[in-house]
A protein has these predicted regions:
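A short acidic, Gly/Pro-enriched loop at the edge of an enzyme's catalytic core
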Residues: 105-119
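Conserved class I S-adenosyl-L-methionine
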Residues: 1-45, 61-65, 87, 186, ...
Length: 235
C-alpha cells in the first residue's frame, strides 16, 4: 500500500473525524501526553501576550492542551482536514482561539497572522511528504527566540519499541479501524510510524532546519521509547 499524502490523507481524516475523538479517548495517556508536550514549550506568564500556532490541530485535543499550558495565549489551530476542523470548531472555546483550514504546504493565511511566539506540532511531521520543507516554514514563522514543540512517534531502529507499537496496533487500532470503516487511514498511520525517523534522526533534522537548543524528551508509561517531545528554538 502506498502512503497517503496531501488530499488523499485529508480525505481519509475527513471520514475518520466522526469517531476520532472516541478512539483517542480510549487510548491510555493520549490527552495527558499532549498536555505534557505543550507544557514543555515553557511559555511564560501563562501565555499572556503570546501567539501560538497549533499546526495539525485535528479535532482540537492538542489545542486544548495548549490552553491548559498557556490559558492567556492567542492560539491558532491549523489543519488540512475540513472534517477534523469541523469537530474542533463545534467545541466550546474562548475568543482567543481560532481555526484555519489549510494544508501545511500552503499557509498564506497562517503566515499573514504571524510571526509566532511558539509552534506546537503533534502527530504531524511523519504525515507530510516533505518534513524538511515544513520545518523550514515553521522556522520562518517563528519570532527569533520562538519555541517549537513536536509531539511525535519516533521509534525506528529500536526493535523492542517497534514490538510495542505493533502490539498496540494489532490489539486495538486495527480492530477499531475495521469496525469504523477507516482501515486505509490506519494502515497508513501504522506504516508512517514504522518508517519515520528515529529520535536521533529527527533531532538532527531539526538542527538542519536551523533550530537550536534541540532536546528530545520521553513520554511516560507504555509510550516510553515510542513517543517523544522534541523541543527547540529559533535562534
Amino acid at each position: 500500500m502506498a502512503m497517503l499524502r496531501d488530499g488523499r490523507l485529508a480525505a481519509a481524516f475527513d471520514h475518520a473525524s466522526t469517531s476520532y475523538d472516541l478512539m483517542t479517548s480510549a487510548s491510555p495517556g493520549y490527552a495527558a501526553h499532549l498536555r505534557r508536550s505543550a507544557r514543555r514549550l515553557g511559555l511564560p506568564g501563562r501565555g499572556a501576550g503570546l501567539t501560538v500556532l497549533d499546526l495539525g490541530c485535528g479535532t482540537g485535543t492538542s489545542t486544548r492542551a495548549l490552553l491548559r499550558a498557556a490559558p492567556l495565549a492567542t492560539v491558532i489551530g491549523v489543519d488540512a482536514s475540513a472534517g477534523m476542523l469541523a469537530r474542533a470548531r463545534a467545541k466550546t472555546w474562548p475568543e482567543s482561539v481560532s481555526f484555519v483550514h489549510a494544508p501545511v504546504e500552503d499557509m498564506a493565511e497562517v503566515d499573514a497572522r504571524g510571526p509566532y511566539d511558539a509552534v506546537f506540532a503533534a502527530y504531524l511531521l511523519r504525515n507530510v511528504a516533505d518534513p524538511d520543507a515544513v520545518l523550514r516554514a515553521v522556522h520562518r514563522l517563528l519570532r527569533p527566540g520562538g519555541r517549537l514543540s513536536v509531539h511525535e512517534y519516533s521509534l525506528r531502529g529500536r526493535p523492542s519499541d517497534r514490538l510495542v507499537w505493533k502490539a498496540v496496533v494489532n490489539g486495538f487500532v486495527r480492530p477499531w479501524a475495521r469496525f469504523h470503516g477507516d482501515a486505509e487511514l490506519y494502515r497508513h498511520l501504522y506504516r508512517s510510524v514504522l518508517e519515520f525517523d528515529s529520535a536521533g534522526d529527527f533531532a538532527d533534522r531539526l538542527r538542519r532546519a536551523g533550530f537550536a537548543r534541540v532536546r528530545c524528551l520521553p513520554q511516560p508509561g507504555w509510550q516510553t521509547g515510542v513517543t517523544h517531545t522534541f523541543v527547540a528554538e529559533r535562534p
